Amino acid sequence: MRKLGRSWWIAGIASAVALTTAGGPALAATGPGGFSLRPVYQADDFAHGQAMFILPAGENGLVNAAQLTQFEATGQRPPHSQDQLAPYENLEFGYPSLTDSTLGKYYLGESFGVKTGQIIATQHPSPKVPVVIYRDTHDIPHIYGKTNAALAFGAGFAQAQDRLFLMDVLRHYGEGTLTSFLGPSCADEQMDHDELLLAPYTTAQANAQINALPTEYGAQGRLAVQMIREYVQGINAYITKALTDPTLLPVEYTLFGPPKPWTPADVVGVAGLIGGIFGDGGGGEIANSALLRYLQGQLGQSGGATAFTDFKEQNDPAAPTTVVGTSFPYEIPGHVNPATIAIPDNPSAPLQGGPVDTTTGCSATAPSKAGLSVIESLLRFPSQMSNALVVGAGHAADGHPLAVFGPQVSYFAPQILMQEDLHSPGYAAQGASFPGTGFVELGRGVDYAWSATSAGSDLTDQRLELICNPNGGPVSPTGTFYEFKGKCIPMVNETFPDGAISGKALDHKIHLTVHGVVQGWTTARGGKPVAVVNQRSTYNHDVDSVIGFLGFGEPALTHSAKSWMAAAGHIDYTFNWLYVDSKDIAYYVSGLDPVRPSDVDPNLPTWGTGGTEWLGFLPASKHVHQINPPQGFFDSWNNKPAPLFSASDGQYGYGPVYRVQMLTTQIQHQFALHHGKITRADLVQAMETAASQDLDGLTILPALLHAVAGRHEPAGVNQMLAALRTWYASGAHRILASPTATQYKQADAVAIMDQLTPAVIRAIFDPLFAAGGTNSGGYNVFPMGFVNEPYNGGSHLGSAYDGGWEGYTLKALDQFTGTGVAQPFGSVVTAKLCGSGGLSTCGPALDAALLSAYQALVKANGGSKNVSTWTKDANTVATGLTMPAYDAIGFRSLGIVGQPSIPWQNRPTFQQVVSFPAHRPA
């Protein structure tokens, strides 16, 4: 088998699959008459009404031509496209008084089935397929199939009904063919180019991935293939109906041509895209090389290498982790052999050759406004977000574990997730699914629930292939032969057609080696041509994770924390998975994690000549995992999973500060308030309190106040510091006083913090990263920005504070004040901080930062020196936005009709609140 350490789960699959595909009931509660197609409310549902969820803005994503006309005339959106927006938004203002009995004001019920009298539509997608779709009062589909195949057919039909155009966008994006779908434009070409550098599969190769599942996974693989094929048939059944019924056809197709039938290969395209965005990690070795070279230029070879290690924080003992006190060593190198390191001569230089980003004339044809809107939305796709709070039975008021969790996938119109409730003799799950995939990826089963946050484990390496000439002559700078294990072998060359530009066919030419896709060419070893290749462990296996997702929804396979972990172990993408049932909570970090030779530096490129090949993959027993932790809870907000589970080469934020600390603090606060026994509402309060907090105000600010205590500051600066102290004492929130307010409470402090944070960072680190202030070269090559602010560079993603310089700044300030630091900066770095005198000059540097921030804020606020009236900083002035509008959550349109912005909250897009007071009989 390709995957190590998983065969122990396969043994139990055959009997379980035989049970679920034979047509008999998976649970005795289905009754003596066999599986029922009726959506009986809470049948085989052990949550007893204590499972809830929300997904703004609404389930319905279909806008037909008549509805568009109505919207343009009256502003009225289609039914159920916005009915979850207000409950989601209003939690920010209602959470302080929240109780279990009022959760229903902010969340929908996630019970199986539909209450009597709440079915608004009943659909029979095909007279030949035994499946029925029931729509509830929020238009959420509850799909009941007589067989697993029938269920999959119904899921395809329902997903097409709610998200057909979005699914079309995703399949073309995942296949690198947006240009042929949305029309020619430079932006389309660029996105196709970038996607083909990640997953350049021909239709035959994509189909081969699916066809290989039975060989790899036996009966479970055969079931997956059957369900994928029937899912596609369900999509096509809807397309057939929509082509003859204008009320079923998304209006976007009047602009881009009628929808074309789906194939199983399209599912691979969507799966690869979603997994590549949310479930990948690593691949930053070339960028790391650029930072290393910069630091060595400033500090010398040895000093630069030491500084690089300091800033990389691969295993900082102060990093907050989800598993506490138990180590899971991964990527801990021994003595690194310098000969294995392959750094380009100029790692900052653009790569040469390879598929061109855009073709000459790509701008000759103006893109459609609708197509451009879609592209702009896709360019702001989020990555690596999501949070989870899971509390064990010992801290639950009723003795049953609690969970408040979900993915942060940004905000789209229609939403990039959809809700569904799926039932067949062998499958029972409700929750969220990525349209184009079919299964419930995040949700609840009969007596358990699960969710995920992106983990970012190191699945991808960058290698340098040494170019050669098979005839022994001169080597071309962009040659397509390379050395591997002593031989000069050819690359595989593939051509991907992608529409036409100015009447000429547009083709993307892709080159592949034994390691992966060629990203381009450069030089190393003093001018020798090399090709840069990304080696991704999940390459050509993008659909394999369906085995794990399928298992999550199969009651015969998932019936306990351990059996759920077994399913999670079959997900190759890198996610932090969290689980809850009536007795247990559990955590498992999935990913097809390569095992590398011990003499390789995992943070830098390696040679592809054959001497540093992967040694297999991390077995399940060595993945981070735990059931019922000693601390009584799990929380995850994309932080480090466990001690010694190394930060991937692309992760620089795993130092002493991470946003998960806001969740930890609030969970512990709820424990203290309620004598260690909390409710679902208490846990929601913990989550929502953190959702409006400013991480910089909670971490950098107290250290800064300590650092400048007793220093003589101007009167205006002292007024600023007083406002900041008051704000910090009240929780450092960025929140409106009421839903109708136009400015933040304590707006002066929010403006001060936003202006001051980058000033403090630069005061400390400019001597190293801006060469004493003469340039910004070091910052330009650093793989992480100062602060991941809510504005997100104009993307308005909602998620914020996911990695930044808070940890570095806290370390430097604590070292300046003599406060203990678990893993301090070494002397080679501290000698460069703040000024020529190193750390000893940080006092005057901080004074200057405070004064510069004060002066900038006076200017931003029209010359006012009355700190209490400030409502702006330099950024809000530059954009012309108020601070709440600057932070606000924006819904990016993936269709014709959008959604309004809402006030900022740093919480999951799709969120579940669950507890199970009972469990099925053993």
Where are these regions (language model features)?
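Secretory targeting and sorting signals
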Residues: 2-29
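C-terminal/peripheral segments of proteins
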Residues: 29-698, 713, 726-922
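Accessory, solvent-exposed terminal regions and/or long lumenal/extracellular loops of proteins
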Residues: 700-703
